[in-house]
Regions:
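Single conserved hydrophobic/aromatic residue that forms the stacking wall/gate
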Residues: 188-198
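Catalytic cores of soluble metabolic enzymes centered on carboxylation/carboxyl-transfer
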Residues: 2-190
Length: 198
């Protein structure tokens, strides 16, 4: 099975995984897909896939591991998620594949599919482990990618893809503060923080 089968499924409307199972059970290709021959497969729109991983692009794509402290995925028209073990509280070990979720964006035109993917990536909130999201956002906005003039050397020859700030985790910090005040009756002030540091 092709790794990017979701892209093919989105533009053809054929569930490739289901078709393979049906064919293995003895159905014909026509019975499994609803298409009598190849000429009946009509391509509709454009799709692209992104693999969100726990790899750190600024550190030679070394996989990160640890506990996912927050996880919110993207949704919306034209967005398909094929997930793994990505959820708040999930533990990513060094012995596990770094893939968290595959995101496929479909739209009538390539530029709209790219815009949908960019929006979806901006909706993700993953905390506790490093991810490649900011790197992929840079890639999707890069003029060479948008002009469809990239080659297999694109990443190696485009250092500005790696220029991004790590996302700040303001939401979790605020929630931790509220929990400390509510549950532990702790109220941090600058004086209290100085005393605590010693």
């Amino acid at each position: 099975m092709q790794v990017e089968h979701t892209v093919t499924e989105e533009v053809t409307g054929i569930d490739i995984v289901q078709a393979q199972i049906l064919i293995a059970e003895g159905k014909t290709i026509a019975e499994a897909t609803g298409k009598e021959n190849q000429s009946e497969v009509i391509l509709n729109g454009h799709a692209l896939q992104t693999r969100i991983t726990t790899e750190d692009p600024q550190n030679n794509f070394i996989p990160d591991y640890g506990r996912i402290t927050a996880f919110r995925s993207a949704t919306g028209m034209g967005i398909r998620l094929d997930g793994g073990t990505a959820y708040a509280g999930g533990v990513i070990t060094r012995y596990y594949d770094s893939l968290l979720v595959k995101v496929t964006a479909w739209a009538p035109t390539p530029s709209k599919a790219i815009a949908r993917m960019d929006r979806a990536l901006r909706e993700f909130r993953i905390r506790g482990v490093s991810t490649n999201i900011a790197f992929v956002e840079n890639l999707l906005k890069h003029p060479i990618f948008l002009s469809n003039e990239y080659t297999t050397k694109f990443i190696d020859t485009t250092p500005d893809l790696f220029d991004f700030d790590k996302r700040r985790d303001r939401g979790t910090k605020v929630l931790t503060y509220i929990a400390d005040v509510s549950v532990n009756c702790l109220l941090y002030t600058s004086d209290a923080a100085d005393e605590e540091r010693g």
